[in-house]
Design a protein with these regions (language model features):
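Amphipathic/hydrophobic helical signal segments and adjacent flexible N-terminal regions
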Residues: 2-50, 55-159, 246, 258-275
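Short secondary-structure boundary micro-motifs
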Residues: 105-106, 112-118, 134-137, 168-171, ...
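Residue-level recognition of well-ordered beta-strand positions that form the cores
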Residues: 128-134, 163-165, 197, 221-223, ...
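Central antiparallel beta-sheet cores of small beta-barrel/beta-sandwich binding domains
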Residues: 139-230
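Acidic/His-leaning functional-site neighborhoods
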Residues: 205-257, 265, 273
Length: 275
């Protein structure tokens, strides 16, 4: 077997952390990765910018172009290499990506893989749900204020994956724009309790603990909330989740802010559209 030639990790083995750091131009120093070079080399940055501006470049102006193309290692060469790599992927999107070599998640409890026994108490939640909801708890406010899709799926292991996408609605029901995004996991425990971890796109991570209220209702409250400096000042939350007699997924979420006690934040009733 011929040994791999040139820089870069051995293609027959996974790259080491040191190899990856070298490829992206960094090294581990004092417990952190620090840059060792600028990924866009400065010897032709101005030349590349000028080329983009007027569609041409003159090697006499200090650029890295030669009669045979960009000088290897120059900024021009890096740009050209990136363009060539993009040719194979520029027309593709998420839906075009080949499937993973492992079973896909399912939101249908009748499909394989089977639901893990630990998740049986949460079985009614598994599915794809879509509907509308409202903010707060204003008297007389009955018009939907947002739309929402919730996907609760599994891969046969003892947890459920949770994803929520919402969109804001105008008073006439038309779409106003995108709303909140959440991803997380339900993790049922041997003692019957439930952990729910939720990450919010607005810069917050919540850890809920709770228990079943019945065979089709669950109550949870936050034990910990982490926020980035730019996130809303939410300091706690509760969620009551249940399946209604007519088969909808319904919930009420309360939130507490740094200067406001727990109060209703959102509520919705979602129809099962898959699962």
């Amino acid at each position: 077997m011929t040994a791999p030639q040139g820089p870069g990790p051995d293609p027959h083995h996974g790259p080491t952390a040191e190899e990856i750091a070298g490829l992206v131009g960094a090294e581990r120093t004092a417990g952190e990765y620090v840059p060792t070079r600028n990924p866009v080399l400065p010897d032709s940055a101005d030349h590349a910018a000028a080329s983009s501006a007027d569609g041409s470049a003159d090697s006499a102006d200090g650029g890295a172009e030669t009669a045979h193309g960009p000088v290897p290692g120059s900024g021009d060469a890096a740009i050209l290499a990136a363009q060539e790599r993009a040719e194979a992927t520029r027309g593709l999107d998420i839906a075009d990506v080949p499937p993973l070599p492992i079973p896909a998640d399912t939101a249908n409890v009748r499909a394989r893989p089977g639901l893990h026994p630990d998740c049986q108490p949460l079985l009614p939640l598994v599915g794809v749900w879509r509907g509308v909801g409202r903010f707060g708890n204003e008297p007389g406010q009955n018009e939907p204020q947002f739309g929402q899709q919730v996907v609760i799926s599994h891969d046969g292991r003892p947890f459920l994956r949770y994803e929520s996408i919402s969109w804001l609605l105008e008073p006439d029901g038309s779409v106003k724009g995108p709303g909140s995004r959440e991803v997380g996991f339900f993790r049922p425990q041997p003692d019957g309790s439930i952990e729910l971890m939720v990450a919010h796109a607005e810069g917050r991570i919540e850890l809920f603990y709770g228990r079943p209220r019945s065979t089709a209702a669950w109550g949870l409250s936050t034990d910990a909330t982490l926020r980035t400096p730019t996130a809303p000042p939410v300091v706690g939350a509760t969620r009551l989740i249940g399946i209604t007699p007519d088969g909808k997924l319904a919930y009420v979420e309360e939130r507490a802010h740094s200067d406001v006690e727990l109060a209703p934040h959102t509520s919705a009733a979602l129809d099962r559209i898959a699962g």
